[in-house]
């Protein structure tokens, strides 16, 4: 289908391996004598923010910018162009947020402190999910990759809204006003057919700063910028959107995502007890991710097709959808972020055990999701092409 996406995921397969290696190294370091140095580096302040915040709010905004570009292009000229195919991942994402939250509440609804973490298993870590899928290379149909892209970004946008509504203590009205104004400027540039990317970069940077200062998760700015970049260039010009995609791909695949994994995967197991590990909090999170995610995504997807609201993407069957739904149980970094908002300051023990629940659920979902994809996909790239044609 689209050579740009194929090239991206071909390169991403190597990036996916780096992602897993970086996460594994971080876990080893966090549980070794080097943990103190590891934490010290991440919490070192540079230009008013810690290194960890620069990675999660700065570098990851670039990743979300790339995702915004990918999804916009697919909506306009690719696999999500029709209403039926575009609505499919949106419905799946809604199910993928509702079911995990309900499972968590079933385990922790009677605890007034633990209930604050109800949104923790509702998240999907798009970076890790894409990295695991990319390990299977060209065996994965392009349409299935696009489905995961769209589902995960809608899921993450939903979580951003949840954070803004339920976990943002002090929202800055001034910063939000500037953010909305810059969003308007970006789409005005698009409407006026401005194709020079420098204008989008300058205004987008101001938007990112405004969103960062507003109290809302700064990565949302990357998505907005991505959707504002024009797909069509002026006569005789290349597509600005595709040009930016090509420019960002190697940096995202081989630098940003591995650094992101290294900075976020280091969870210390010091002081952890078996009774704490099997308590309602970590179990609710782990089962929310491992059971709730696939239950919600698959059920809503099946119902959407069954009742004629949407249709399956080309070359994709329900075995593939179920495998991807399990893969979406990798909540990891976005879940950890919500955990820190819910428990970090007031209850460090809750924060520790919630992170372990996230780790248990996400790791199991990653292994099981990879296995299910491996056995359900065509054995070769050629067979995958034949299934689509």
Curated annotation (Swiss-Prot):
The gene is nhaA. Keywords: Antiport, Cell inner membrane, Cell membrane, Ion transport, Membrane, Sodium, Sodium transport, Transmembrane, Transmembrane helix, Transport. The chain crosses the membrane at residues 14-34, 47-67, 87-107, 117-137, 146-166, 171-191, 197-217, 252-272, 280-300, 321-341, 356-376. The lineage of its organism: Bacteria, Pseudomonadati, Pseudomonadota, Gammaproteobacteria, Vibrionales. GO terms for molecular function: sodium:proton antiporter activity. It comes from the Bacteria. InterPro entries: Na/H_antiporter_dom_sf, NhaA. This is Na(+)/H(+) antiporter NhaA. The keyword Transport applies. Na(+)/H(+) antiporter that extrudes sodium in exchange for external protons. It catalyses: Na(+)(in) + 2 H(+)(out) = Na(+)(out) + 2 H(+)(in). Pfam families: Na_H_antiport_1. GO terms for cellular component: plasma membrane. Disulfide bonds: none annotated. One of its GO terms (biological process) is regulation of pH. Belongs to the NhaA Na(+)/H(+) (TC 2.A.33) antiporter family. It comes from Vibrio vulnificus (strain YJ016). It is found in: Cell inner membrane.
